[in-house]
Amino acid sequence: IDAESNFYKFHNAAVHRGAHQLAEEATDAFEGARLKVANFIGAKEDEIVFTKSATESLNLVAYAMGNAEPGTRFALTSKDRIVVTEMEHHANLIPWQQLAARTGAQLSWFEVTPEGRLDLSKINSVITEDTKVVALTHQSNVLGTINPLEAIVARAHEVGAVVVLDACQSVPHMPVDVKKLGVDFLAFSGHKAVGPTGVGVLWSSLLNELPPFLFGGSMIETVTMTSATWAAAPRKFEAGVPNMAQAVGLGAAIDYLTGI
């Protein structure tokens, strides 16, 4: 609360958009928060995208895949499969339902056992050779189950699929290192990490391979009246004026979690 309040009182200006002192201070605070988030999950700064929520982060990935050029790595067709689990939050289920509907891809899922765990007994028949995406929660917000990522990630990568991880519950409650997890995309929200509402995070080392999600200011490299080129990630996915104070507040929350 103090971090957000101080930002609004003393540093409030649109980031990346001015050469005056206030804009420079705002940009430094915003990018400082990005560095804190990156360090907290073992990532690089340019792999961190600020969104308004984990829901938006997951939708960003699914929507961008739906916009991928045919024949590129993330383009899906009716010959492809998307895998989720029965324990997913709606934020990590419905975007993939919609992507399957848009592209004709088949949606499949891991079932949950009576003990509240994923049934991996048929992992090879769920994650098949034609699977392009495996999306799952790290820790269930309903059951508390911590999913066994190692086997799932290994099988997904064996068939060339990417793994999208909903880490909303795990990031605030346990050490999370994206390199050790081996996943390809990871999302979490600010408010579940004792931070503000209105801010979320998307991490990936593959961001520059995806097309943009939104278009507008701050995300372009060049623009004419007939065309535009995109800035490099993460700015490519941060169109418009971002939730600056909320990002700074999340940075303060990360400081708190780091100190526990």
Can you say where each PLM-predicted feature lies in the sequence?
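Pyridoxal 5′-phosphate
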Residues: 1-260
